[in-house]
UniProtKB/Swiss-Prot annotation:
Protein name as catalogued: NAD kinase
Gene name for this UniProt entry: nadK
UniProt feature coiled coil, ranges: none
UniProt key word Oxidoreductase: no
Family: Belongs to the NAD kinase family.
Binding site for NAD(+): D67, G68, N141, D142, R152, D171, T182, A183, Y184, S185, L186, S187, Q241
EC number(s) recorded for this UniProt protein: 2.7.1.23
Reaction(s) catalysed by this chain's protein: NAD(+) + ATP = ADP + NADP(+) + H(+)
Protein function: Involved in the regulation of the intracellular balance of NAD and NADP, and is a key enzyme in the biosynthesis of NADP. Catalyzes specifically the phosphorylation on 2'-hydroxyl of the adenosine moiety of NAD to yield NADP.
Pfam family, one: NAD_kinase
Amino acid sequence: MPTVGVVLNDDKPQALEVARRMADWLSQREVPMGIPLTRVAELVHSPSPELRDRLRQLDLIVVLGGDGTLLNTARLAAPHGIPVVGVNLGRLGFLTEVEVSDLFPALERIIAGDYRIEERMMLEARLIRDGLEQPSYFALNDVVVTKGDHPRMIRVEAAVGDEVVWTYSADGLIVSSPTGSTAYSLSAGGPIVSPELHALLLTPISPHALDARPLVIPQDQAVRLTVISSHSHAVVTVDGQPGQPMVCGDSVLVRKASVACRLIRLGERTFFRILREKMQQGR
């Protein structure tokens, strides 16, 4: 029997009730739960050393929530190679695989090993200040340098490898993975990229130039975003988490991560079928 973890977003009205029903279901079938029912906020912001140790021993994680909950969980699961399956309690759910009405039939298949793994490319981001590299972060969707809540645009120099591509005056810049191409980057006018293609996308947010267009960059290249605004109000965010302030001269180096998100898939729905369904649902 696989050892299962359950992570929930208790901001969702159904989440706690569904989690308890699921825990009972697993217990009745003597499926071991490697961690107690865990709120995603605890997992991301204040995990105990014991919780971190037990997380590494899981065979799979079931996520009850929406795409945001799955993103948060995936960043912690990916370094340990733990597969993740999302149960959609949100609205669109591009990444989640199971609707809550189908939860228990889906669990039967998962426990029996009747699923496939879909690997998604992730990003690694590192803030560089005064020439010193700060600890790195993983992202499944995107890394964003933005003006935050300040009304003025920021100036950001974008380099690919050692070559400066452009200096943007804009509300910000998005570096996204193919998975993130249907998130913030899409709303900023970026292209939709199949997750089977490994690449980095550079998308400006409301640029002050008509010729500032999105770029698609090979997976083996790193993107460096350097704040050159004299007024220091830029912020860098990873997968929409609370941001870290940046000052003039700070850089963020973004590259393809050495780890990947492993998503559990049950059906044969293609990326483009999911895209059609979710786009129509979001109208």
